[in-house]
């Protein structure tokens, strides 16, 4: 039901406008009667779905440094019962909005105000966002005009490209740009061969196998927001015949995907969607296969081969849109068919493709090391 309501708000401009005006007014009035707690920090990751990403990196930093022990950290989740060791509140409930009005510090990778505008004077808002965008986001998506980050005090950017995108997509203020990169990606810089080997061991990968991480992005709902299914045109039995002697595949669906159709898991194709830390999977992987996901930019930090399997590119381009043509920028252009993808993997020149990935990384990512500490100091002033 919650997903359905969110879908309606996103896709019905009239209902969205009424909701935004009325509820923003209600919460602004409520805010007049709720005193700000200078030691309360509200965290939200992926709209309350997970305990991960850059907000978790910031939280972990605060827990590890004595100077931040005096802060009370509250996490908002869709299902707080999954996180018994954290202080939590259920997102999109009256208690959540009271907490948001009370907390002096907001930290998220999506949004805190839930499409509304009720931030009070003196509250500090850090939005890391959750990746560099290939596909249109925010107000750049057809039919959307509801993103307004003018209340965000600090917005993480990875480079000049992000700054251009966020200006149109979010109406972000240039003064809010925190030019530090993403805290979640900090551990991907300078990964050693020993760390890679240890991660593969933790994941149970045989020593004689290479790892392909396949991580497609989500697709828009076809049933009015009831579900977000994905059925990639993939025949993993053929992949096994062609690649099984040398590789294993880790299949990771986007967090917003509700169901993966047509995929049978075994020793060759392993389910990785439920694994909590995507960075672990990237560290272990020798090759990334994706499509329009921000994971391509994250993985590029490792300077390893990337393949773009854009089987529905023409349709996706028409329905969603992208900021640039994949074949103009991606390190290995794109593959439109399964046969082409398998052929390229079998013929890969690892060194050449790694160099191509580095050029791709350097075009889009200018900042990254020290991101977590920089975010904490910007938000808390110490």
Give a label for each model feature.
Residues 106-129, 275-319:
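A donor-sugar binding/catalytic signature common to diverse glycosyltransferases
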Residues 40-190:
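Active-site and donor-binding regions of nucleotide-sugar-utilizing enzymes
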Residues 1-47:
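Membrane-proximal basic amphipathic "stem/tether" segments
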